[in-house]
Amino acid sequence: MTIIPAIDIIEGNCVRLEQGDYKKITVYDKNPLDVARQFEDAGLKRLHLVDLDGAKAGAVKNWKVLETIAGKTNLFIDFGGGIKTEKDVQIVFDSGAALTTIGSIATENENEFRSWIQKFGAAKFFLGADVKNEKIAIHGWQKITDIDMYDFIKKYLDKKVTQIFCTDVNKDGKLQGPSLDLYKNILERFPDLYFVASGGISSLKDLEELKNIGCSASIVGKAIYENKISLKKLELFNSTN
């Protein structure tokens, strides 16, 4: 199972929000490049980079942070937050992202997202299925829809989008453990999915459990910044899995 460390960006700073609440912000580092280099030095290969300013504004804002990290590391980066137009997708790829992370647009403007799939290819997108009580959440979790998450996942699997990450809004930023039952249900329904767990991870035990139920990868954020899981331990886990 691949470990994907997360960097969330507000005003160029490395931050974390609790449950997507912009009022519950913690600034961890003012230099995201330094953080990314620490991940790379620990042998991690991927990076989940989130533009929280963009997510709130509905347009890409922190593309220069992406450009800097992509230009000065060899990390395989997925980047998302506020991507609403084809121009934004192009900016993300031009700035060095390997994958564009898609969330709200796949729910609110399916035709637009379908056109991006046709232009760039389904393999270039990392689809976020953020959920609360098995319903899709959008706009940085500020809005809970009536869309069933299983229907949502199936729709885009049928369109050949195979990399999907799922964040349980009830768990994120709380370090209370991942939603194992939820993820098991998803993996049982969609065994061919490259499924990435996200939210609530607080220990190596959590990562072992996610690996054991069949997750392809796990996004780890707050647990790193709060020193619940050291980079040394992540490096060891990564090298033996």
Give each language-model segment a name.
Residues 14-60:
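N-terminal beta-alpha supersecondary unit
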Residues 1-3, 43-46, 73-77, 97-98, ...:
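Short, well-ordered coil/turn segments that N-cap beta-strands
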Residues 8, 39, 47, 92, ...:
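Conserved, mostly hydrophobic/aromatic
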Residues 28-40, 84-90, 144-155, 207:
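Short, acidic/polar
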Residues 12, 17-23, 98-172:
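Conserved anion-binding
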Residues 48-51, 78, 101-102, 126, ...:
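Conserved beta-strand positions in the central sheet of alpha/beta enzyme cores
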Residues 3, 54-70, 84-90, 104-126, ...:
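Active-site-adjacent beta->alpha loops and helix N-cap segments on the catalytic face
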Residues 73, 77-99, 181-217:
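Catalytic cores of alpha/beta
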